[in-house]
Amino acid sequence: MSNTKIGIFDVTQKSNKQLTWVLAVLLVLEALVCVGDYIGLVGVSRGPLVYGISRITQSGVGKVLLPIVCSYFFIHTWFFFRRSLAAANSMLRYLVLAIIALIVCDMVLGLMPDSFSTLEQIQHPSKFTSFASSFKSVSLGLQTLLKTVLSIGLIVKFTGRIRTFAWVTLVCVLLIGDGRYLYTYLYNAGTGAFNQGLALGMMVFKYLTVVIPVIFLRRTMTYTNVKSADGDTDIN
């Protein structure tokens, strides 16, 4: 890697289009997941739209498959970013590879039969269910740590849109941690309409802290009509 800091990664025109539609689909799916969680939490009054969304998001299959499909699109975007880092000969690509590996593990656990939770499984979890729950908690912590280290590395080694993405990711990681504690405290302290409004605010907060980093990640890779890093077949 030269002394000149890279501010943006160049990808092929085909990859640029793929990244754009993947982002668009991901934004819609994440919105469905968040709205579904809100409906399930506060029991919003039924209507045609609410009923349709709840049918998709609150069924056993929907609760499992929607997050898995979202994870697939996250992996797709991270994969292109990792490949761009590899083309730039940056060791940070291994951090991205570790993040991808953890997401894949979460996906595999989500596809296991015990993931389709019933009331009986929730009240009397199997050994696998307990293991999966513990693993996902550990995975979340490791991903948070990896993203923090990755962000610091990107801030030091790169510039432009790549550095902006790193700062955005770092801020969102910190906000998510603090937001969970604040939400739990306020929810336990409040009642009735306050908690319903708090749940709505948390839904919006969760959606924004998930999708904003992905939007900025997408902006780090674009087609500039010159020889592309994405054209390199190296996938180390």
Regions found by a protein language model. Give the residues of each.
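Transmembrane alpha-helical segments of multi-pass membrane proteins
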Residues: 24-27, 89-106, 166-178
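Alpha-helical transmembrane segments of multi-pass membrane proteins
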Residues: 26-44
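C-terminal transmembrane-bundle signature of multipass membrane proteins
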Residues: 31-32, 165-168, 173-236
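N-terminal juxtamembrane cytosolic/stromal segments of multi-pass membrane proteins
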Residues: 1-22, 83, 225-236
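Membrane-helix boundary/juxtamembrane motif in polytopic membrane proteins
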Residues: 15, 151-176
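Internal transmembrane alpha-helix with an interfacial aromatic "cap," most often the third helix
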Residues: 65-101, 145-158, 217-221
